[in-house]
Every structure is written in structure tokens, then in C-alpha cells.
């Protein structure tokens, strides 16, 4: 009933009873006082193993005990070390001459087993073992009189005690026996193609084989791989600058008309369409990163609620204008893009406020006279009279239509006019059409190495280790498995490993928000245009100036209608071919493309003559660098040293070669997230990784069409002669009919023996005649010609049965042997007989000489690609491997497509007004606008040139 049997324990000695019968049972007296505690009894025998009790509740977590001493290195042989990084591929050797096919060598004996590798490093500390079982109950106590007290009821299960202190590390385990050799692992990845071997010596010429039959012509080979695209040719020499066009005749100034009344202000016009996009400007150099600030990083607070957008602050005071940088030398002009179609002309905007009248500039030099214009129409008054005195200057008339643009004059040297008031910002026009992408710029020098990136997020929790071996219980009996203990605190951070190689450049960060628009600069008075100078030689590119603040983004205007596409201009003459440029760096080899579907077999062509062996081709591209190997074994945790003082920041030294990857230390506690650093410089694209393991085999596709018959190979050696069959004798055919005997012919000359006629049926035996007397031997007559067999006669009726045969006569003399007759024609084949029993195998003949190795057959067309198998479940995330060395710099990639415009960020702090940059080059003249309404503005002009405000 769940109790224990203590009958095996020693019982107290019983006093000998008197031989009387049992008396009556007395009344039970009152319970006496408890006796004094007796001396502790001797140690009882170990009781039987108790039944396992119910698992106790998990007690509160005890205080963290002191760190135990580091465990001793275990003697278990560690796993096989990770595969080392692949060495740099050697230069491919020269292609050797193809030697004759040698004889197959004998199979070699298997090599001796390799030596055991060095034992691996100590593995990580295992999880604590299972909880021991409840021990057996102790011996029963004894009273003062030595009697065994009654066994009390089972007490309630006590609460679990506090967790015990970690035990001392166990003794060093002994080195276990050498395990059995494991099964052969899966085939490793295909090794890299070795260098071609040295050509072997030319073997002796073989025996000339028999001329084989001419084989059928093989199918046409697959088309070769397309060669790599050639290097881009050098840039052509720019052509000469075209001559300036002829200057048109200057229009006649009409007489000034009366001043009209000032009209009402027109409504705000719709924004005009944007002009064609200008060529892209040169990229500025990236600024240097400032020094890191001091101070320790505080703990990361909880993320606050996102506040609403604050009110826009007052614009700050304008900062001091920065120093204008030196004007950079003009870079090389990029190829001119194709001019986009002209958009529809937008309505003119509202006229701005008229600025203060500027001081008149000094008159410029007189430009060269243009060609004489056409003769105007004769005036109403006939021939002009003599010139009278100059009258008073009349009012300015309306501005006539603009005449053709004359050549630019020299720039005026007058003082700069006073700045006019700021005009209102016009509405922003619609975005212009995207210009043609400019030519690819030259690759700049490699930038400085980027700063070390922020530490990545903590990896996923690794799988729990296997439980340790069950330890001995207190009383030698293993207890039941207790609940799994809580995960221990993370260990201390290991010693910092050596700095890894510089990582690849990270992706460019998103563009920051646009700053506030600076105040517009003072608009100067328009100077007179000078003559166009000859195009100078392009100067060297100077350092980029300090970029000015970016203005606020205006409201998006209405998009104008798309204009009609203009006709393409005439194609210019091709420029002179420049000298070839230096060869570019060798790019990485691209991945092999997927095999295309098998095409139909082409027609069989005529065999061409074998060409001469060409020269050895250039060396191929170097293969891609292999992927990083498996992570190394975990190193032992070093002691944490004291933090040193911050030293003086020295100059940046040269980038050293990548050192060996150190072992990964134990995972430290997750630190607080630091402030976001500036986006790192985009690194160079890394080398293509090694091809992954082959995926599961797809479903076998339908068989492809049969390929063309390959060329017939050389005739192989003759095989051993098979056993000779012994057929059974076929059944005899039916006997033929007996022909009639023809008349005896005259003996003629001996002709060739004729073909034997069919055997006739045996006639009925004739009447037995009497034996005649033996005649004399006559002379042999001349053999007559064998007559043709006559037609088969009708078989006569069977004759009467004759008597018995007479006595056999004596044999006649043997005649002379006649001449051998000619071989008659082959008779018809008889019916096939029954197959005879298999004969005994004959003796094995001698082995024939090995035949020459046949040519390799043409490679069959690739079969249809099988269906793609289902994607397997993702495996567990492995530990991060060591950072591999930086791969070689790949070729510059093609310019990517223009990304979608990002969302407009919040308005930044208004920047200080930048200094006025140098004047940009004059843009192309825009299309003439429609004539505006005649307003009542102020008219002023100089030397007959009128301007209307």
C-alpha cells in the first residue's frame, strides 16, 4: 500500500515469556510523559529505493554564486577544423600538346590511413545536469527503551529548497577510446580545375588498324559562347567650333506712338513648361568626417510616443557667408545629350515689381557691323529730303518684334547698378523632361576606408545543448530527472580579437531632407552682351567649392501639355578615331547563364578541311574568390583588463594586410543601442560567392529528341569465339517421283555434269529376272552429254508384287574416277531445324590486342530542364563567420535607373545665405514668347535699345 517493509532490519531482543496462557487484555493506561531522548542508534542499513516523489515546485532563484574556476580542457577529440581559405589561384600554365592516349594503368593500392588530427579546442560549458532523485528514507529511530517507534504518517511534500551552490568542477576526464571510423561522408564540392599537365613523351606508333567505314557526319556543334564585349573606344577629338552666324539687319525703329492708358493687371498666368534638362553637374567631393565626440553612451530610454508636428519656428539669423572657394577648372565636357522636345509655351507670369532704376553703365564697344539687310519698302513721301536739324526726342513707341540676335558685344565696364528689391517667387514650373543620360565618367580613385559600422543586432538564441551525463546521487541511486534549470547569466565578454579586414563598402544612406531656401541674392542690372569668344581649351578640374544651402521647394505647378516631338537633326560627320586608351582592369567572371532549350538539329553540312592549330589564346579571367570558410573553434575566455586612458589620436596609417581571422569570443551581453552614425561610404562590390550546394533533383523531364548519329568509332578488338552450337538433324523431305527412262542417246563428248535432278519415288519392284551370264568387259565408251531431265511422267499403276529378291550378284569392276564436276548452283534453303542442345563451351582463346581508343562522341543536346523543386525549409541560423578579406575591386557597374522621388521630408532649419556663386554659362536661347499686352509701364532705353518694365 505504498509503505516500506522494514522486516529486514534487526529487531530488539524479546524477553522469554512464562509458559502461561495469555491473560486478559488490560485496560489501556493513560499516556505517559514522553521519555527522554535516547542515545542515537547505530546506523541502519540502507533501505530499498523509494518510489519517485512528485516533482517539487521550482524554488526562487538563488543569488548568483561566484564564478567558478575555469574548467580543465577535456580530452575528447574535437570536431574537424574548418576548411581553410582557398589559396589564390595560380597563373594558368601554357596549354600543352595533346599526347597520345596512353595505356590504362593498373589500379593502385589504397593509401595508408592518415594520422589523427590535433585535438580541437575545449568546447563550450554544458548545461547543468538533471536533478537527482529523492533519496531513500533513513533508518528508523529508537526510543529510550530501545524500542522502535511506530512509523508516522507520510508528511506533506516540502517546498523545494533554494538552489545549491555550483559544485566544484569534476576531475579531468580520461581520453576515451578511439572511435570507429565513421561512414564515408558525402562527396565534397568539385575541386578547382588543376593546371594542365606536362605533355607526356610520344609513344611508339600503334599497329595500323583496319580502315573503318566512313561514319555519318555528326550534328552541328552548339554555338560557342559569345565573347566578352570589347573595351569602349577612346573619346573622339572634339570638332572645331562652328563659325558664328550672320548678323541680321537691325529693324527700323518706328515712330513713337501715343502712350496708352495703363491696363489692369493681368491674372496670374499658368506656369510655363520646364525647359530641357541641362547636363549633369560635376559631383562634389565628400567631406571629411569630424572627430568623434567624447562621453559615454547613456542607457537607451524607452521609445517615446511620436509627438505631433511642431509649429514652424522663426527663421534664424543669417550666418556669415562662407569664404568663396577657388573657382574650379572647367572639367572635360561630356557628350551633348539629344535635345528633348520643346514644351508648350506657358502663359507669362505676373510682372514683378519694378526695381529701382540702376545707374547707367558705360557704353560698350561698338560691335562689328552686320551684313547689309534687304532694302526696305520705299517711304510714302518718296525720296527722303535733306536731313534737318534734330528735333526733340519723342516718346518711346511700342516695342517692335525682336529682330535677329546680333553678335555679342564686349562686356561693359560700368559700375554695378544698385540692387533692386526682391521680386516675388514665381510658381514652380512642372518637372522637365528627363534628359538623355550623360556619358559614363571615369572611375575616380578609391576613397578612404569607411568607418566601422554599428554592431548588428544580437543573433537568435542558439539551441540548448544536450543535457550532461547523469551524476551519482547522494545514496548511489539515480534519481528522476528534475525540471530543466533556468538559463545562466551570460558570460563575460572575451578578449577582443584582432581587427578584421576592412569590410565592403555599405550602401549609401537615404538623402537627407532639403534645407530651407536661402534668401535670393541681389539681382544685378543686365549688362550688354559681349562678343562670343573662341572656345578655349578645357582647364583642369579644380576643387569643389563649398556647396550653398538648398532653397525651399516651391509648390508643384500644373503640368503643361506634352509638346510635339521635333524631328531628329541631321547626323554629324563622324569624328576622327582617337588613339586606343589603356586596357581597363579585368572584371570578375560572370556567372554561367542557364542552358537554353535544345534547338532542332541543323542540316548536315559538308565536312570541312581541318584547320591549322592556332596560337595559344590569352589567359582566361581569374575565377571568383571562394566563400568564407566555416567559423573556427571557440577560443577560451580571457581575463578582462583595465580600461586604458584615451591616447592621442595619431595620423591614419596605411591599411595593413588582412590578418588571420581570430576565433569568435563568447557572446557578450547585449549593449544599449548607440546613436546612429553617419552613413558609411559605399564599399566596392564583393566577389561572387562560391556556388552553393546542388539543390534537390528536379522531376525528370520528358526525353529530348534523339540526337544525330555520331561518327563511327574505330573497330574494336574481336571478341572471344562463342560456343559452337550443335543443331539437330532436320526431318527428311518427301521422296520425289521417279521419272520415265528416256531413250539412250548417242555417246557424245563429255560435257560438264548437269545439276542433279530431284530424287524420284521408288518404283514398284519389277519381276525378278533370271541372272544373266556375265559378259565381257567392254571398252569404256565416251561419255555422252548429259541430257536435260525430261518432264516428270505420270506415275504408273503399281505393279504386282514380285517375289523375293534373288541372290545378290557379284560386284562389278570399279570404274575409273570421272572428272570433278563443276559446282552446281545453291539449292533453296530447307526449313529451319529445331534448335539443338547447347554445346559444351570451347576453350577460351587468347586475349586479343587492346583496340585503339575511339574518339569521344559528340556531346548530346542538353535535356529539358526539370521542374524546380520546392524550396526547403530554412535551416537554423549558423554563427556568424569571420569577416573575409576584401575582395578585388570589381568593374564599375552601369549607372542604375533613376529612382522614384522620395517623400518630401520635413522642412529643415533655414540655412545661412550662401555666397553668390560664379555665373553659370549662358543657356540656349529660348523660343520667342507671344507678344504681351501693351502695358503702361515706364520706358527707358539707351542708344535706341528700349526696355519696358
Swiss-Prot record:
Glycans are attached at residue 95. This is Collagen alpha-2(I) chain. Keywords: Extinct organism protein, Extracellular matrix, Glycoprotein, Hydroxylation, Secreted. The modification 5-hydroxylysine is found at residue 95. It is found in: Secreted; Secreted, Extracellular space; Secreted, Extracellular space, Extracellular matrix. Type I collagen is a member of group I collagen (fibrillar forming collagen). Prolines at the third position of the tripeptide repeating unit (G-X-Y) are hydroxylated in some or all of the chains. These protein fragments were extracted from an ancient mandible bone collected in Haiti. Residues 921-931 have a biased composition (Pro residues). Trimers of one alpha 2(I) and two alpha 1(I) chains. Interacts (via C-terminus) with TMEM131 (via PapD-L domain); the interaction is direct and is involved in assembly and TRAPPIII ER-to-Golgi transport complex-dependent secretion of collagen. Residues 263-272, 292-313, 435-444, 530-539, 671-680, 722-736 have a biased composition (Gly residues). Residues 27-66, 147-162, 208-229, 273-283, 377-396, 490-507, 519-529, 562-606, 613-633, 651-661, 682-691, 737-771, 779-792, 810-825 have a biased composition (Low complexity). GO terms for cellular component: extracellular matrix; extracellular space. Its main location: secreted. InterPro entries: Collagen, Collagen_superfamily. Residues 634-643, 835-846 have a biased composition (Basic and acidic residues). Expressed in bones. The modification 4-hydroxyproline is found at residues 10, 13, 34, 40, 348, 351. Pfam families: Collagen. The lineage of its organism: Eukaryota, Metazoa, Chordata, Craniata, Vertebrata. It comes from Acratocnus ye (Hispaniolan ground sloth). Belongs to the fibrillar collagen family. Residues 1-949 are annotated as: Disordered.
Amino acid at each position: 500500500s505504498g509503505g516500506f517493509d522494514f522486516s529486514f532490519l534487526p529487531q530488539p531482543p524479546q524477553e522469554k515469556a512464562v509458559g502461561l496462557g495469555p491473560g486478559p487484555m488490560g485496560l489501556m493506561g493513560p499516556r505517559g510523559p514522553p521519555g527522554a531522548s535516547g542515545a542515537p542508534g547505530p546506523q541502519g542499513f540502507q533501505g530499498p529505493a523509494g518510489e519517485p516523489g512528485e516533482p517539487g515546485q521550482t524554488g526562487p532563484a538563488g543569488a548568483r554564486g561566484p564564478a567558478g574556476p575555469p574548467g580543465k580542457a577535456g580530452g575528447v577529440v574535437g570536431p574537424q577544423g574548418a576548411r581553410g581559405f582557398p589559396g589564390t589561384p595560380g597563373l594558368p600554365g601554357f596549354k600543352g600538346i595533346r599526347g597520345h592516349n596512353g595505356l590504362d594503368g593498373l589500379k593502385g593500392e589504397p593509401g595508408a590511413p592518415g594520422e589523427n588530427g590535433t585535438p580541437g579546442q575545449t568546447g563550450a560549458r554544458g548545461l547543468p545536469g538533471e536533478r537527482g532523485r529523492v533519496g531513500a528514507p533513513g533508518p528508523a529511530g529508537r526510543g529510550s527503551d530501545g524500542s522502535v517507534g511506530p512509523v508516522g504518517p507520510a508528511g506533506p511534500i516540502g517546498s523545494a529548497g533554494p538552489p545549491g551552490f555550483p559544485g566544484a568542477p569534476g576531475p579531468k576526464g580520461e581520453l576515451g577510446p578511439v572511435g570507429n571510423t565513421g561512414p564515408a561522408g558525402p562527396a565534397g564540392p568539385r575541386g578547382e580545375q588543376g593546371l594542365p599537365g606536362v605533355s607526356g613523351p610520344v609513344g611508339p606508333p600503334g599497329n595500323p588498324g583496319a580502315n573503318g567505314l566512313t561514319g555519318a557526319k555528326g550534328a552541328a556543334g552548339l554555338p560557342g559562347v559569345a565573347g566578352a564585349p570589347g573595351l569602349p573606344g577612346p573619346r573622339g577629338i572634339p570638332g572645331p567650333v562652328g563659325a558664328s552666324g550672320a548678323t541680321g539687319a537691325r529693324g527700323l525703329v518706328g515712330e513713337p506712338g501715343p502712350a496708352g492708358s495703363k491696363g489692369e493687371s493681368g491674372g496670374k498666368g499658368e506656369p510655363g513648361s520646364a525647359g530641357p534638362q541641362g547636363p549633369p553637374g560635376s559631383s562634389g567631393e565628400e567631406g571629411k568626417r569630424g572627430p568623434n565626440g567624447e562621453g559615454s553612451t547613456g542607457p537607451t530610454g524607452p521609445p517615446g510616443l511620436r509627438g505631433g508636428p511642431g509649429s514652424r519656428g522663426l527663421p534664424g539669423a543669417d550666418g556669415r557667408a562662407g569664404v568663396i572657394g577657388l573657382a574650379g577648372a572647367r572639367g572635360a565636357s561630356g557628350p551633348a545629350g539629344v535635345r528633348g522636345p520643346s514644351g508648350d509655351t506657358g502663359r507669362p507670369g505676373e510682372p514683378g515689381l519694378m526695381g529701382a532704376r540702376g545707374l547707367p553703365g558705360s557704353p560698350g564697344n561698338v560691335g562689328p557691323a552686320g551684313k547689309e539687310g534687304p532694302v526696305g519698302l520705299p517711304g510714302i513721301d518718296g525720296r527722303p529730303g535733306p536731313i534737318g536739324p534734330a528735333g526733340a526726342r519723342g516718346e518711346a513707341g511700342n516695342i517692335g518684334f525682336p529682330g535677329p540676335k546680333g553678335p555679342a558685344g564686349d562686356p561693359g565696364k560700368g559700375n554695378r547698378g544698385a540692387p533692386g528689391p526682391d521680386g516675388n517667387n514665381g510658381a514652380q514650373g512642372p518637372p522637365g523632361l528627363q534628359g538623355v543620360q550623360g556619358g559614363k565618367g571615369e572611375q575616380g580613385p578609391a576613397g578612404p576606408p569607411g568607418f566601422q559600422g554599428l554592431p548588428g543586432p544580437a543573433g537568435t538564441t542558439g539551441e540548448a545543448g544536450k543535457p550532461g551525463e547523469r551524476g551519482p546521487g547522494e545514496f548511489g541511486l539515480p534519481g528522476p530527472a528534475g525540471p530543466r534549470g533556468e538559463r545562466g547569466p551570460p558570460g563575460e565578454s572575451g578578449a577582443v580579437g584582432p581587427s578584421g579586414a576592412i569590410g565592403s563598402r555599405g550602401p549609401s544612406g537615404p538623402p537627407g531632407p532639403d534645407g530651407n531656401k536661402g534668401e535670393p541674392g541681389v539681382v544685378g542690372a543686365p549688362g550688354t552682351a559681349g562678343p562670343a569668344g573662341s572656345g578655349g581649351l578645357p582647364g583642369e578640374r579644380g576643387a569643389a567649392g563649398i556647396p550653398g544651402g538648398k532653397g525651399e521647394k516651391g509648390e508643384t505647378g500644373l503640368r503643361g501639355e506634352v509638346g510635339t516631338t521635333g524631328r531628329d537633326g541631321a547626323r554629324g560627320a563622324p569624328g576622327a578615331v582617337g588613339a586606343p586608351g589603356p586596357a581597363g582592369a579585368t572584371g570578375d567572371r560572370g556567372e554561367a547563364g542557364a542552358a537554353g532549350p535544345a534547338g532542332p538539329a541543323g542540316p548536315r553540312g559538308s565536312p570541312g578541311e581541318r584547320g591549322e592549330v592556332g596560337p595559344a589564346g590569352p589567359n582566361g579571367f581569374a575565377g571568383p574568390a571562394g566563400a568564407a570558410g566555416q567559423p573556427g573553434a571557440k577560443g577560451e575566455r580571457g581575463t578582462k583588463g583595465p580600461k586604458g586612458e584615451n591616447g592621442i589620436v595619431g595620423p591614419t596609417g596605411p591599411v595593413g594586410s588582412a590578418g588571420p581571422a581570430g576565433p569568435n569570443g563568447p557572446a557578450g551581453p547585449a549593449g544599449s543601442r548607440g546613436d546612429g552614425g553617419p552613413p558609411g561610404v559605399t564599399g566596392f562590390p564583393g566577389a561572387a560567392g562560391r556556388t552553393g550546394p546542388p539543390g534537390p533533383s528536379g522531376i525528370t523531364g520528358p526525353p529530348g529528341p534523339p540526337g544525330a548519329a555520331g561518327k563511327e568509332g574505330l573497330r574494336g578488338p574481336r571478341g572471344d569465339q562463342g560456343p559452337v552450337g550443335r543443331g539437330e538433324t532436320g526431318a527428311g523431305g518427301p521422296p520425289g517421283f521417279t521419272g520415265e527412262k528416256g531413250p539412250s542417246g548417242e555417246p557424245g563428248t563429255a560435257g560438264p555434269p548437269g545439276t542433279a535432278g530431284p530424287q524420284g519415288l521408288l518404283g514398284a519392284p519389277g519381276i525378278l529376272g533370271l541372272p544373266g551370264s556375265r559378259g565381257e568387259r567392254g571398252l569404256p565408251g565416251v561419255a555422252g552429254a548429259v541430257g536435260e531431265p525430261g518432264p516428270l511422267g505420270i506415275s504408273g499403276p503399281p505393279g504386282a508384287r514380285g517375289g523375293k529378291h534373288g541372290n545378290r550378284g557379284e560386284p562389278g569392276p570399279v570404274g575409273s574416277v570421272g572428272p570433278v564436276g563443276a559446282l552446281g548452283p545453291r539449292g533453296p534453303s530447307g526449313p529451319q531445324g529445331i534448335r539443338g542442345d547447347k554445346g559444351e563451351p570451347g576453350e577460351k582463346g587468347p586475349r586479343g590486342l587492346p583496340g585503339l581508343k575511339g574518339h569521344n562522341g559528340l556531346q548530346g543536346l542538353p535535356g529539358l530542364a526539370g521542374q524546380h523543386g520546392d524550396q526547403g525549409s530554412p535551416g537554423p541560423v549558423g554563427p556568424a563567420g569571420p569577416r573575409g578579406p576584401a575582395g578585388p575591386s570589381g568593374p564599375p557597374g552601369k549607372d542604375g535607373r533613376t529612382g522614384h522621388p522620395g517623400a518630401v521630408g520635413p522642412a529643415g532649419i533655414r540655412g545661412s545665405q550662401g555666397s553668390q556663386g560664379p555665373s553659370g554659362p549662358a543657356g540656349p536661347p529660348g523660343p520667342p514668347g507671344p507678344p504681351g499686352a501693351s502695358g503702361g509701364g515706364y520706358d527707358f532705353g539707351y542708344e535706341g535699345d528700349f526696355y519696358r518694365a
